Amino acid sequence: MLSLVALALMSALWWALIALPRQADTPYPLGPYNQERCPLPGEGSGTFKVLVISQLLAKPLAQALCHEPALTGRFAQVEVSWQARGELSAADIMERRYQLLWNRDYVLTGLVPRYHQYLAELLALPDYQVYLLGREPVVLSSAAFAGKRLGLLSDSESQSGYQLPLHALNDAGIKPEPGQLRFFRERRQLQAALAKGDVDFITAIAAKGHTPWFDPAKALLIAGKVPAGAWFIDSRLSRDKALSETLVRHLEAAMKAQLARPW
């Protein structure tokens, strides 16, 4: 099992992954900007649809599932798409538009109070920690923040990428001036901005033992034990134990690799 999610998943993953099960030498051609799609051999019908919240998790997960024998013969193709978490609708759940997705229980309950009729929990993810990570050690005070730039995710529904860092500033009595907050679409853009000096610190998440890139001397913990949510599967497919175990294996491999890379 993992010691942290991703995504938020957030994300936010988000994530060029390296620890997926070994794939065929020739990858399948994949789809448009917000979607990765590939055919499955055999006589299956319909599409196995996966919803993630980060582009960086989509392609490697699609490549893994496109070579997965457990899906061959049952489905005609695999489609992995990503979108902002706020775009998931009650209709998406009740019409079973996705066979696999990440989210949090309270979000799904808010959309469809009886969502368990449509989705079953497949893989619960452990809590994680949120930090401010700087080019220099982070001190959270009005004086230290003066003239500094903080990188956040532009997704206002992201706990780790948006809400918790702003809560931390508010708790410290810090009122950012115009231009001190910089917003980015993905976590890899945050990390790149920090490395180039475009921002002075960013919001970050890390798991002990899984993030060799993370420098604790330059990080300030702002929230511990943040619920990471879970992966959910179409309740009709959850009865297939072999398929469920296969999907868990792919998800764990993908997220483990994700943790070893910069957010």
Question: Which ranges hold each PLM region?
Answer:
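Short, hydrophobic alpha-helical packing/hinge segments within bilobed ligand-binding/sensory domains
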Residues: 86-92, 187-193, 199
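N-terminal hydrophobic or amphipathic helices and topogenic motifs
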Residues: 1-97, 249, 253-263
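Periplasmic-binding protein-like
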Residues: 43-46, 124-134, 213-254, 261-263
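Acidic, polar ligand-binding/catalytic clefts
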Residues: 22-28, 85-144
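Structural motif
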Residues: 51-56, 103-105, 135, 154-156, ...
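Sec/Tat-exported extracytoplasmic proteins
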Residues: 69, 97, 105, 136, ...
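A ligand-binding cleft/hinge motif common to bilobed small-molecule-binding domains
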Residues: 102-114, 193-226
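Bilobed "Venus flytrap"/periplasmic-binding protein-like clamshell domains
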Residues: 45-70, 129-186, 191, 262
